[in-house]
Every structure is written in C-alpha cells, then in structure tokens.
Amino acid sequence: MAVISMKELLEAGVHFGHQTRRWDPKMDEYIFTERNGIHIIDLQKTVKLVDEAYNFMRNASTDGANFLFVGTKKQASDAIAEEAARAGQYFINHRWLGGTLTNWNTIKTRIQRLKDLEAMAEDGTFEQLPKKEVVLLNKQREKLNKFLGGIKDMPGLPDVLFVVDPKKEEIAVKEANMLNIPVVAMIDTNANPEVVDVKIPANDDAIRAVRLITAKMADAIIEGRQGQDSAPEDAFVAGDENTESIEEIANIVEEGNN
C-alpha cells in the first residue's frame, strides 16, 4: 500500500511544476511532460518517493530523532507550524535566521532571552516596570517568538530537516549540509535536487499540496514514536484500481488549461 495515492496527489495539484523556462535541468528525471509552458511532475515517481520519505522519517523517529520543519513562504507557513506541533516536533515558519544551525550556541542565547521575557510576563515582573519599558520588552518578546518560538524547546541541533522548497530555504539547506544533517524536502521543478538527501518531487507552491505532504511526514513521525500497531489512522491508502495513469493525468491537465 502507498502512503498517498495518485488520486490524492492529483486532487491536491502536486503534479503542477513551474514554467518550463524556470526549470532546473537536474529535475529532468522527475518531470513527465510539459503542457502549455508548464512542467508536469511524474506522479508515479512521486508516489514511490513519498513512500521512501515516509519510511525514512518513521525509522528516524523510532530511533528517537528530533525533527525541524522548515517552510517560511506563506503557502507553507501554517501547515509547517501545525503539523510539526501535531507530531511533537519543532518548526521555523517565518524567516530563517542565518546561523540557526551553524551558530546554534548564539541562537540558544536568544532563545533563553525569549524564555526569560516570557517568565517576566508571567511572574508579575512586568507589573513592576514602567509602561514604556514593558512595551519595548513585549515587542522584543513578540519578535523573538515569531522567529524562534517554534524551536524554543528544541534540545539541540535537529537530527533531520523537513523542508518545503529548498530553493527558498537555501540557507537552511546549506547549513544542514555543512553539519551532515539529512534533509527531506518537497522539491519543485525549479530547484536543484542534489542538495537534498530524501526527495519528494512536488508542487511546493500550492497550499493543498504542501499540507498533504507535510501531514504525511508528521504521520510518519507519530507512527515511529508509537510503533507500527499505533500507526495514524489512514496513514496508508489502499491501491485504487481506478486511479488515473500518468498519461490520463496529463490529458486532464491539458483539458483544464484549454
């Protein structure tokens, strides 16, 4: 059984790549065809590679790995935060601060500052300070929470990065590569797949597509933590004899563009 069916991928628009003029030639093996100037991703390969990514995430989770979900563009921001939290993991969904991984010790000092400010807000310290100072401290707390709130409880460097759009998150991927932290990523037709360890060829600009893939990666982590007998409901889908072939999908796409 596959983790995600071809039909689910199609309905979420996972097959739509970028304009052909924006492609990265290294993605050629994951492209099925071109329709009206748009590359169409080979969903038969995506189905298999989602399975591989799911197994990788599940196995790492079983081994106790910590995961950092990264996706800062608006199409990914909500799904990244919600699915990481559902899996009990960590996330960055607004802006990647350079050095988050490679200068972790400095980042930890900013996280501690955030925690200190939160404690001050809760223990009544703010009530004893001048209002102007409290306003400034609250602004600082809000800014730190925006960028670091998703990793404030991360015990150390993550063991695995899950990334939506490694082209957009180039700095995060480079830092992970430098530290030999494996990267699992949704990768569109405009990006270089060679910087990613576990590839999921997919439309990384559609909210539904991002949500679908990200949720399955969260399912994998949950299953790994709980064990095979407690796999998330509907984590796997039965093979659908009526699922469209990739040729039929291409025709559907072409008809939809006419």
Curated annotation (Swiss-Prot):
Which stretch is the leader sequence? none
Keywords of the record:
Ribonucleoprotein, Ribosomal protein
Q: Which GO terms describe its biological process?
A: translation
Cellular component GO terms held in the UniProt record: cytosolic small ribosomal subunit
The question of whether RNA-binding is a record keyword is answered with no
Q: Which residues form a coiled coil?
A: none
Q: Does the keyword Ribosomal protein apply?
A: yes
Q: Which InterPro entries does this UniProt record tie to the protein?
A: Ribosomal_uS2, Ribosomal_uS2_bac/mit/plastid, Ribosomal_uS2_CS, Ribosomal_uS2_flav_dom_sf
TM segment ranges: none
* PROSITE patterns in the cross-refs: RIBOSOMAL_S2_1, RIBOSOMAL_S2_2
Recorded GO molecular functions are: structural constituent of ribosome
Spell out the family assignment given in the record's similarity comment: Belongs to the universal ribosomal protein uS2 family.
PANTHER family recorded: 30S RIBOSOMAL PROTEIN S2 PROKARYOTIC AND ORGANELLAR, SMALL RIBOSOMAL SUBUNIT PROTEIN US2M
* Protein's UniProt name: Small ribosomal subunit protein uS2
Q: Corresponding gene?
A: rpsB
